[in-house]
Amino acid sequence: MDRKKLLKVLNLDNFTAIDFETTGLDPKNDRIIEVAAIKFKNGVITDKYVQLINPEVKISSFITGITGITNKMIKSSPTEEMIIDDFLYFLGEDPLVGHNIYFDDNFLKNLCKRLGRDIQKHVKYDTLQLARSVLFDQPVFNLAALSEYFGFSSKGSHRAEVDTHNTGMIFIELIEELASHPIKLISTVYDFIKDKEIPNQKLYSDIAKELNKAGKIKTGLVKSKIKRNFPINKFYCEGKNEISNFDSETIFGNDGILKENIDNFEFRPDQIKYSKIIKEIFSKEKSIGVIEAGTGLGKSMAYLYGAIDNSSDFENNGPTIIACHTKNLQDQLFNNDLPKLSKTLDVPIKAVLLKGRRNYLCKTRFKWLTSDSKTLDKNDLEALIPIFFWMEFTKTGDLSECSGFFNSRREWLKSMICSEPGFCTGEICNKQHSCFYGKLKKLLFQANIIVVNHSLLMVEVANPGILPEHNSVIIDEAHNLIKSAYDQFKIDWTEQNSLYQIQNIDPSSPRSARWNSILNTICSQNPELSKIIEDLKRSIKEAKDSLKVMMINISNENYSQFDPLKTYQNKPILKNIEKTFQIVSEDIDLMEKNLKNIIELIDKIRKSILEIDNTRSKYGTLHSIFENGHDKISHLLSDLMCLTANQDNDTVYWMEGEFKLKNTSKERLSISLHASMIDPSVNMAQNFFNRFQNVLLTSATLKVNNSFDYFLKRVGLKNMDSVFKKDFLSPFFYDEQVTFHQYSGAIEISSDFEKIGNLVIDLNRKFKKRMLVLFTSTKTLTETSKYIKNNI
């Protein structure tokens, strides 16, 4: 089906794309400074309306910086009252398309209301929502990024005409991509959103009708133009050779196998030395190696060879664990280096890439949440649409692949659909077939190499049993290990998270409707259990009320320690927590009492259900819900006590503050409480390093002042005898290839993006070299980047 016909059957042969530039984000109090509307007929531009508007208020320098529209430019422009009738006439009854159509629609409605005009009820389409859904794996969804993705110029973006033109063109591309999907997916999404009035609803309906009419079941109306290559989390290589047939020289040497078989492979003598040291570390009964290997040495290939060699005795030694800090390195190791090395050597290997279980989608929980869309608001519905599309393609179930979901900033929804300890059990999730995390856990026990991140490795320290029994660990990017250790041994208390944990076990919550209906069936024949459930509902309400009061009072008592005018708030350390919380002690005591009541009632419910179903075969869902709820509320109670009482001298306590709804009448300070072990090194030594026979810690930067002492002390290796230390310089000629410049002028420029930008431009013109400029402020970086683009 060609484009013209597709638009016709979807009732989009005529549509109008719109975009407004405004003095701010508030549709009631801010004003429009530029409008653009472009008419499309059969996918071709036929007419346009573009007009600067005098808002009769001053345009801030911030808005001028974004749009390029100055007060001088709009001084002689017509006011909104002078253009509104012509603009509304131009819009007519056509469907309206916008990028985040809610923004433009709200400004249009307020404009009409303010000037006493009726507005035609248009069918609305949103390219932002569509892009998040059908391009769910793209990293960015702003108009400029999407324009470049589809090959349209983004020059002049944030001016209404350019943005409107690109919105219309992008919309057509997105329609074609959406129409490439089969009826099952399109109908599923339509059924999910049909009860709420949201943009693109009619598009899903029209595509479904046309697919039905055409009798297409497994294919779409058109073919997709997108080629997707989705990541995997398991890698198998059958391999005919034994790894014992190779050594470092035959693999990495100047006449070695990698040199012969891999394009652009460079012989590096230190790579061979590094590889031999790793093999020596893993051959000893007990050995820990700390090796600094400069960038470009080829350390990942070298330690992967060591891991494959070490794992050849998998039955006796278990798998080799490889841990790194960044996702980029994980992807490089698993999707590039490991396959390349094992296939080139043709050796057998079974490898798995594992993340913490909350990174994975639980199909059961997702089905429960989406089966009753009435419990979700419009924003929730739109945020979840990308998940439906991503599920058609994912091979891993790793939610981080679905950027479209996270782009909506409804991250709390992740906690409603991710795999959950104590909930995602075989008895529940087996019904959904191919449970992502459960399937991966089974593969772990067959793998001889397991790639994880530092965070999961530290979770294993605190709660052994996530990984199979193993004796050998390789830690790359080891300079970041201590940060992950602090994060693991840290306690956080926020009102939002605490409320979520309490609501999770609330039978009266709309999101508990599915399991609550099962509970109601049991209660109808069990008056005693019914009474306990009512007591639980009452206790949960009291806990939520006391939580709100407690956090408000903590915020009020500590308001003076924070400043709403500051971008970055202080994080005051609490030297005496009993004194800090003395004034709100009654609130804390009440919160403690309510949490204990909930735990006691959950215990009674668990006991009652077990008496009815002692084989756990009939009400598996309820068993899991209340067991998990008991663990979560108990953990919440423990955190509250740790943070507000019984101060530990080996722990640092602090609070953080964030001003919500800034610069509005509803502005408020939200406080969160935190605690962390001051020095996790002792814990690391006892519960981590002492557990294993062989450990390699490596990175490009481990030494401080040419010594490993600081690093060894921080990670708990200072007093261990079996630590081997070695460093290798980078093979790059930094002194010849790179020069470092630091500004030391008398004028302070660190927060002045124009002066920084001019300095960068001058240096670029002087040296005529590629440059890397380092910033510590994202805001300054962004503003400087814009300034350079506009002035270079």
Segments predicted by a language model, with ranges:
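A contiguous, basic/glycine-rich beta-loop/short-helix subdomain that forms a polymer-engagement track
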Residues: S415-N448, M458-P464, I598-S744, S751, ...
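Acidic two-metal-ion nuclease catalytic site recognized across multiple nuclease folds
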Residues: M1-L10, E173-T250
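Conserved non-catalytic scaffold segment of RNase H-like nuclease domains
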Residues: M1-V123, F136-H158
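Conserved pre-motif I regulatory segment
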Residues: E242-I291
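A substrate-engagement module of RecA-like helicase motors
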Residues: F230-F235, S248-G256, F314-N448, P510, ...
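Signature of the SF2 helicase/ATPase Hel1-core->accessory helical subdomain module
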Residues: Y303, D331, P421-I449, N453-K593, ...
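Conserved helicase motor "Helicase C" RecA-like lobe of SF1/SF2 P-loop NTPases
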Residues: T776-I792
